[in-house]
Amino acid sequence: VSRLNDLIRQVGRKDEVLASDLQREVAALADRRSFGLNFERHVPEAVELPGRPVRRGDKVRILPPRGQARTAADERLWRVTRTSAGEAEVEVAPLDDDSDDARTTVTREDLVVVAEFRDPIYPGLVSTGTVERGGDKPFHTVINAENYHALQALLFTHRGKVDAIYIDPPYNSGARDWKYNNDYVEGDDLYRHSKWLAMMERRLLLAKELLNPDDSVLIVTIDEKEYLRLGLLLEQVLPDAKIQMISTVINPTGAVRGSSFARSDEYIFIASYGVTGAPRVSRSWSKDGHATSSAAPAEPYWRNLRRSGSNSLRSDRPNLYYALRVDPSTGRVSTDGPGDEVLPIRPDGKDGYWQVSAAALPSLLGAGFVRSRRHRGEWIIQYLATGEQAKVAAGDFVEEGREENGALVLRGVTADLTVATTQWATPSHSARHHGAVLLKALIGDRSFPFPKSLYAVEDVLRFFVADKPEATILDFFAGSGTTAHAAMRLNRQDGGRRRSISVTNNEVSADEQRTLRDGGYRPDDPDWEALGICEYVTKPRITAAITGRTPKGDLVTGDYKFTDEFQMADGLEENVEFFTLTYEAPLQVASHRAFERIAPLLWLRAGARGGRIDDVSDGWDVAETYGVLADLDGAGPFVEAVAGAPGLQLAFIVTDEDRLFEAVVRELPDHVEPVRLYESYLRTFELSTGGSTR
């Protein structure tokens, strides 16, 4: 190796870029393990960024004429050497030949920017829509992005703060199901395992930085094609984690593959930090799919007495709109007693209706099946529905007394719980019945290959976030959005405020790409992007789950099954915002000219709840959970506003001066975390580009 280093130094005197590339390759070879998992991790990985504006210094590819397929020559990398605002053409030079003779002029529309994963990026976010039915709950987030770059962005917002990561990466089947360096990885590619491992390692190294090091879990599903290599990779990337593997039946009838055994299961790797207590389920779980995946006893589910979801307006059931009374001293609910008046008003301010008639309510009150709770100054009325009442009658819940408001105090019985095994075979995990069929009910005939069972994802997450009602859950291979959907269902079951972050690209299937290309379309054309997975599947599925309506506006047909059974048309009381990742110029960021795209990252770092500060043209602003000081002349009123906001956690201060930053920090309340902009932002992305991307 020393002789190679001498030769590289000689090369560097003539070509520094070539010498740097050679040094990186030699370092990768020298870093190989004597034992363990060795693979070609030094193979460079790059991604095209359609729609990203072309700037001087960018790496680009020249696109073939519209309607023509790409050839090997089109994969050549070029660098933009000259560009002017308003000009349709730019000058480019081959990355491997910077001579004047090699330079050429190309129209902007025939170029696509390329980012190699060893290059620093400076991400922002642009909102592409919201669905709000969750009142003051935190927002779930869906990000349309290359997931490696999205993970880098999340280092700024969520480093060490994620409670659970669930991913279902490509299985590397050879069936054109994933790309490396913009090309599908075929089954006969001799390096397909190395490419898959290199792709996974880069992302797992970033994911490790996002997990809470004291108490968190990484869950990865995989099949037989890569499970052996994935297990070794997890041991190398996460040496301090406790790692187990579960075999779970997802296709009870089995998939016949030639002369092989019919394949009926896949594998779940669970890598956990600080998790204590054995995960438990009901003894009947494998038979009926009703999960109680918690070491704690099952608790009764108190539903909101006000109807939610579709058909929840007063006009739908006018006879169920009536006033209740709550005694403020005891919380006792009645239809005609003293106290505060409570009406079934929806989160959007419109009149709704109760789920029980005025005539039937007194019997539920007498049985202790109705209770009141105070939340943010308002009364919420809850009740036990028929299914929960039956569990009380069957002895699944033991009465320990009554609250002052007359409601039963119930304790779950733990006698039927047992430690979950590493072999799962429950009807609720069928990928066809509770993945594909359920997805079709939500979004119709929009196709998506191999969606997970909603209840399978829900069950495995429940083991680790049942006792974390405000958990942050990340899925950076989000696909159709099953993980976000599962997190929302968990919230409904226990009144939680968990938030999910779903990352998916907007890749179009291989067949659709061919058809679109033959029609003269390119990536970033509206007709092309409309068929991408994020726009065509993920966003519509999550929207349908919340609203209870399909993309066509029809009510979703069918019912949710197992642990929490209700009509899918009811929807879910949740909030979600959809974003697309942008690529910013560092000088624009540093000079405060990209704040509109950086603003969503600040909001995410503050918990994705409450209002977002998108404009600080007045010098400063304060929202529920964070504040931004852009002009230090306003430091006095800013500090006063921060001190008067009890829920505020973060203060972002825009300054290049250490002394001025420290002066503002000294005036802030002790519980408020100060963050300096844009130093903290820029430094995050300069440091996140390193060994993991070689």
Where are these regions (language model features)?
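Accessory, often C-terminal, charged low-complexity segments
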Residues: 1-134, 138-140, 155-159, 163, ...
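Active-site-adjacent bridging/hinge elements
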Residues: 173-182, 424-439
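Glycine-rich S-adenosyl-L-methionine
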Residues: 187-206
